[in-house]
Each structure stands twice: as structure tokens, then as C-alpha cells.
Design a protein with these regions (language model features):
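Short acidic/polar segment at the start of the alpha1 helix of CheY-like receiver
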Residues: 15-19
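Short hydrophobic/Thr-rich beta-strand motif most characteristic of the beta2 strand and flanking loop
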Residues: 30-37, 45
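Active-site residues of response regulator receiver
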Residues: 57, 87
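The feature encodes the CheY-like receiver
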Residues: 61, 79, 91, 110
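C-terminal output helix
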Residues: 111-120
Length: 130
């Protein structure tokens, strides 16, 4: 069982299997997890829950992860939340584009569970408090 005081991670991915897989990795590592399947849900969940970190797929239906990230970083109540782009965009420049949109880090999927957890922990350790 996850400690209710452990950091809450919002996992945003339109692909249910990916969301569930990332959630399991994180829960197994001691994190609490909330999920969203598109950019609109990501913004709503982030505003309501104030997670410690957001894993954001950039290719989402409706409002994509790029726009959701821009909106969250523009909002005073969520701009401090680290956002890790979790995406299949492995093209040159995708990482830089994600950072320009406001992402704090970039992980290419598929990624190994340990690599994802290491990056989440690294970002939480370097995050500025609200």
C-alpha cells in the first residue's frame, strides 16, 4: 500500500495500457498516482490535485501535451510543478521543443521502468517548492 504522504504523480497518456504500465512502475516505487487521458483532463487534474510532478505525453487527442504544458506553466498555481515530457518523439529538436513549451525534462518512450523512476526522483529532488 502506498503511503498517503508520498508524492503524487499525474500520468498523462491517451493510451490506457501505457498509463497503467507507468502507474504500476510508480506505485511499486512508492508513489501515489493519478491519471489523465488527454490535455483537458491533465489541466483539470493538475489544478484540482496539485501533483508533485506530471508525466506528460505530448501527442494527445484534443488539447495536446504541448498546449497543456503551456497552460499549466502559465498558471500561477501550477507553474512550479515539474513536467516531464514522456513521448515517442525521438526526432532531433523534440527535446528542445518540449523545453520551450515548458517541460522540465524529456524522456523518450518506450523507456525502462527503472529509467523512468530515476528521472522522476531526480526531478522531485531538484524541484523548487511552491
Amino acid at each position: 500500500m502506498t503511503d498517503p504522504k508520498s508524492p503524487l504523480i499525474l500520468v498523462v497518456d491517451d493510451y490506457q495500457d501505457a498509463r497503467e504500465m507507468y502507474a504500476e512502475y510508480l506505485q511499486f516505487s512508492g508513489f501515489r498516482v493519478a491519471e489523465a487521458k488527454n490535455g483537458n483532463e491533465a489541466v483539470e487534474q493538475a489544478l484540482a490535485l496539485k501533483p508533485a510532478l506530471i508525466l506528460m505525453d505530448l501527442s494527445l487527442p484534443g488539447m495536446d501535451g504541448w498546449e497543456a504544458t503551456r497552460r499549466l506553466k502559465a498558471d500561477e498555481s501550477t507553474r512550479h510543478i515539474p513536467i516531464v515530457a514522456l513521448t515517442g518523439h525521438a526526432l532531433a529538436g523534440a527535446s528542445e521543443g518540449a523545453k520551450k513549451a515548458g517541460c522540465d525534462s524529456f524522456v523518450t518512450k518506450p523507456c525502462l521502468p527503472d529509467d523512468l523512476v530515476v528521472e522522476v526522483r531526480r526531478m522531485l529532488n531538484t524541484a523548487k517548492p511552491a
